[in-house]
A protein has these predicted regions:
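Transmembrane alpha-helix interface/packing and boundary motifs in multi-pass membrane proteins
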Residues: 119-131, 225
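Terminal, membrane-proximal amphipathic helices
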Residues: 1-118, 145-245
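Structural signature of FAD isoalloxazine-binding scaffolds in flavoprotein oxidoreductases
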Residues: 139-143
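Hydrophobic alpha-helical membrane segments of integral membrane proteins
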Residues: 132-137, 229
């Protein structure tokens, strides 16, 4: 007979179940019918162009853009909130106290999803698909940064940046690649391993994943007015990545 789980064990079990649900849903690759219908209209060079745009945007943000992103939230306050939540969880030892970390992260995530939706639809209305990419990544990384701070983690080192990039790639993966990437991330967290891949190479892989996944939606977003539909994809994919994070 199993003994009664303590609050930490119960919360961990809930986290594991949420991860398993995500993996089950994301494992099979799905292609919408409308994507197949517009395939012949999508320029052959668009995926290469998207990859280059994502790659340059990641480089720019990691090298010079993080301080700009941090101006949109109070890092010190979030770090202080984590310390308060950690102390409360240690003293009270209840699931409600433990869930304070998730509530803090969830509030930031929901706000960023709303910003992403407005930004994506607005750019789509004017048919601006490619110029939307730095904004899309900026909001996405802001959301991940805030989640990290809510749980007491940082994002300043290249190793942490590689982790974030790998997380984004994994959230967009399917099948064996999803399982492999997820295992690598879990090992990194549990055993404090280091990644053998360079940051530039991981940027390339993550840019490949984003370009492949968003190819059709960015094509649609590049069409005036109709692009509003493609613009909604910014929020959809940010939610998918945030859910995995």
């Amino acid at each position: 007979m199993k003994g009664k789980q303590n609050p930490v064990e119960k919360e961990w079990a809930a986290v594991v179940k949420a991860e398993e649900r995500f993996l089950r849903h994301a494992m099979p690759a799905r292609t919408a019918g409308w994507q197949e219908k517009i395939t012949r209209y999508v320029p052959q060079k668009l995926e290469t162009t998207l990859h280059a745009a994502f790659y340059k945007a990641f480089e720019l943000i990691f090298d010079r853009g993080t301080p700009v992103i941090e101006k949109t939230y109070q890092r010190e306050k979030k770090e202080q909130n984590y310390k308060i939540n950690a102390y409360t969880a240690e003293v009270r030892d209840t699931r409600h106290a433990l869930r304070a970390f998730g509530r803090e992260a969830g509030a930031s995530r929901n706000l960023n999803l709303a910003v992403s939706a407005v930004e994506g639809v607005g750019m789509g209305f004017f048919g601006l698909g490619l110029p939307d990419i730095p904004l899309f990544l900026g909001v996405l990384l802001k959301s991940i940064y805030e989640v990290a701070l809510s749980y007491g983690y940082t994002y300043d080192t290249q190793e942490e940046q590689i982790f974030i990039l790998k997380l984004i790639e994994t959230a967009l993966s399917h099948g064996e690649q999803l399982a492999q990437n997820n295992m690598e991330l879990n090992l990194w967290m549990r055993e404090e391993r280091t990644f053998s891949i360079s940051r530039n190479e991981q940027i390339r892989r993550t840019s490949d994943a984003l370009a492949g996944e968003l190819l059709y939606l960015k094509f649609v977003q590049g069409l005036p007015v109709v692009g509003m539909v493609g613009g909604v994809s910014d929020m959809v994919y940010q939610k998918r990545i945030s859910d995995y994070a």
